[in-house]
Amino acid sequence: MSNTTVEQFAAELKRPVEDLLKQLKEAGVSKNSGSDSLTLDDKQLLNAYLTKKNGSNSSTISIRRTKTEVSTVDGVKVETRKRGRTVKIPSAEELAAQVKAAQTQAAPVRPEQTAEDAAKARAEAAARAEARAKAEAEAAKLKAAKAGNKAKPAAQKPTEAKAETAPVAAETKPAEESKAEKAQADKMPSEKPAEPKEKAAKPKHERNGKGKDAKKPAKPAAPAVPQPVVSAEEQAQRDEEARRAAALRAHQEALLKEKQERQARREAMKQQAEQQAKAAQEAKTGRQRPAKPAEKPQAAAPAVENKPVNPAKAKKEDRRNRDDEGQGRNAKGKGGKGGRDRNNARNGDDERVRGGKKGKKLKLEPNQHAFQAPTEPVVHEVLVPETITVADLAHKMAVKGVEVVKALMKMGMMVTINQSIDQDTALIVVEELGHIGKPAAADDPEAFLDEGAEAVEAEALPRPPVVTVMGHVDHGKTSLLDYIRRTKVVQGEAGGITQHIGAYHVETPRGVITFLDTPGHEAFTAMRARGAKATDIVILVVAADDGVMPQTIEAIAHAKAAGVPMVVAVNKIDKEAANPERIRQELTAHEVVPDEWGGDVQFIDVSAKKGLNIDALLEAVLLEAEVLELTAPVDAPAKGIIVEARLDKGRGAVATLLVQSGTLKKGDMLLAGTAFGKIRAMVDENGKSITEAGPSIPVEILGLSDVPNAGEDAMVLADEKKAREIALFRQGKYRDVRLAKQQAAKLENMFNNMGETQAQSLSVIIKADVQGSYEALAGSLKKLSTDEVKVNVLHSGVGGITESDVNLAIASGAFIIGFNVRADASSRKLAENENVEIRYYNIIYDAINDVKAAMSGMLSPEEKEQVTGTVEIRQVISVSKVGNIAGCMVTDGVVKRDSHVRLIRNNVVIHTGELASLKRYKDDVKEVRMGFECGLMLKGYNEIMEGDQLECFDIVEVARSL
């Protein structure tokens, strides 16, 4: 006979391929799949294995059972069985017989095998005859017992449930076995009544196959078929194993319950009141769950039956101490349903676990308790930055984002998971969820800058003082510096006024002094504030012939706000109108008291033009510096402040940096606000290239990624990555702040303009050479706005006028102001083609005056009355269908046909209107001059009397100005 495959052989035997492969493997035949070929020798080995395995006891014969009675137990879930049907399962002996028959048909058998098979067949025939008689007697007894159980009262319902769970399995048992099993079931816990009987009823092939064939639909009851019956000796052995298994389960359950109670008490001592209640409820649930397996009629334990008694005892201690991985192996092992159900009872598993391959997929929880023990809540310390998204806040608190959204909804805020919330709201949410919130910029990379600075410690050495020269416009600040520097800076300033912050360092016999020259014009308030911030000493210049002016008072306020000492230089004492004493009195009124009057401020009378007392002024400055004991580390990364910044067409972003500490070197990575970059070049105030600059030295630097804002702090970092990270973070933060301000301004303007007429708007685009200039110009122009005409600065920036500026002006109807900058050729051509006006200025006065004139032209003209003449009514003539006609004499001026008139009676205005007609004799005339008579009628008014006067006037429109 040719070889057959495992799958074909399984079909002949009517067995699953998986079971046949397993049996072949146990018999020593290695087959991996159903397509593997199966030889005659393989079949003989399988036959010998099955014969040896199932025929180990001479008196043991597996039986085939037919179900003739069906249990109808209320509340018992039966998932794999059909009611009222016969379940026919082939036994291992039948499988062996089928294998033998197939082998007999395929090839001649050996003599010794034939003799053995013949003896086996005779024994089976005798056993079948005996089994038939016993089965019939057992069926009759079972029917009688069931009829008696139905007659019992309802009070014995639990006992009935135990008795009715067994008939399916008890059909094929002897009477003695049934009584012994019932007595044993009464001793077991109530949740395991059906297991021992089902264990005794299940044949070995069902245990080996894990109950797969039990799921097949049962056939209708057939005529009595001879069935093999187990011997009394094997039955007694099975009873003993079942009793031991029941005792083992009862002991395990008692240990489990005791362990659970012990664990629950230990957890309850650690938790608060609300966790204690929860733990008690969960522990109660865990103690009740072992009763659930009573609903599982399939929960027999053939695993115990299939093994000797001693190995079961040995596993008792092993199961008690096994870990989670061991439980999983036991659930998937050969033990079948019994092992799984015990594990399910231990873990409080309410779901039914099916046998076979499904049992291998059983996934046990790592914790063998019925509930997850509650843990003590963890309180986090959450650092909340200025703004934070809901998702980030939830991540910091280790909670789900939906919890934060719920908390915000309770507060009346409808937010999404990616929406940003402010710091105050976030702190409230953190406290609401039981954590500790602290306001801090935890995610701010700038928080690490201070740590890095503290790590670098260098010796602090004396440094030159930084002196800021402040005062009113045209009081001689720049001229004073010119004399000190021996230069003519003032001649280079447009209009003779300073419009930038100039930074210079001067070497004197007593040391180096760094000077900052600030603008005195009122438009440059921000520049003066920056100058005071970066300075050590302030020289307040006051003209002796002019006195204290508004910007002088402002400079005093800046110096006091910055907390820096002042030295007053009373300039222009060489003029005839100079009055230094008056200056001292006026400054004393502003709490600037001279030292000779008992104050703490030095007053020096100087003349910048003639150089009088300049050395005394420098001595006073150095004296103040000695008192301050100014020091700074030299061998350290540089830190400083951006004094001024601009965009140069050929060199890019150019910034004037005042080094405050450390040494700035060419090639350093510098971070200044939102700009960063490697310093490509350093230039001093004289235009000379240098490679390094120490404390208190001003330098111009090139190489930044963008034009930084004036007044920003600058510092040298170790690597570009950190500088880029901080710069990008600042850009995002500034963008959020700017958008928030714009939104607030839009809302504010919307409410302010509600109900008002639309005002005229003058749109302007400002481009300047440095940031301070366009800040000053934009601020000054905005101050010109009135309720009727407003200045709208669409864009302001540093650098020349580009095509994008012209395109913006085209779209918005604006004009462009270039302050010390020019437009390139392409921009000029585009502006000419599109009729865009570009105005160039180098003096801030001129720009402000021109814009003021343009705004004045946009104002609606003012209407004024101009009296042209006076008329006296001397006669009133009434004409029918026409009205009253006044005969008048022009007493003053002239009366015109289109004039407005005002009727006056007894010096009281009675009527104001227009003339309907003006005649002299019978002719219509345009005007009548003084001394002539005329006749006239008023339009729509006839109540005139003799003696009334008419005042003639014209309405004239007069242009307004700001």
From Swiss-Prot:
Q: What is a single molecular function from GO for this protein?
A: GTP binding
Question: Which GO BP terms, alphabetically?
Answer: translational initiation
| Transmembrane regions | none
Q: Basic and acidic residues: which segments have biased composition?
A: 117-141, 173-216, 235-269, 314-327, 338-354
**Region of interest (G3), ranges:** 517-520
Region G4, as annotated, extends over: 571-574
Q: Which residue ranges does the record annotate as region G5?
A: 607-609
tr-type G domain span: 462-631
Record's function text: One of the essential components for the initiation of protein synthesis. Protects formylmethionyl-tRNA from spontaneous hydrolysis and promotes its binding to the 30S ribosomal subunits. Also involved in the hydrolysis of GTP during the formation of the 70S ribosomal complex.
Name of the protein: Translation initiation factor IF-2
Q: Which organism is it from?
A: Neisseria meningitidis serogroup B (strain ATCC BAA-335 / MC58)
Q: What gene, per UniProt, encodes this protein?
A: infB
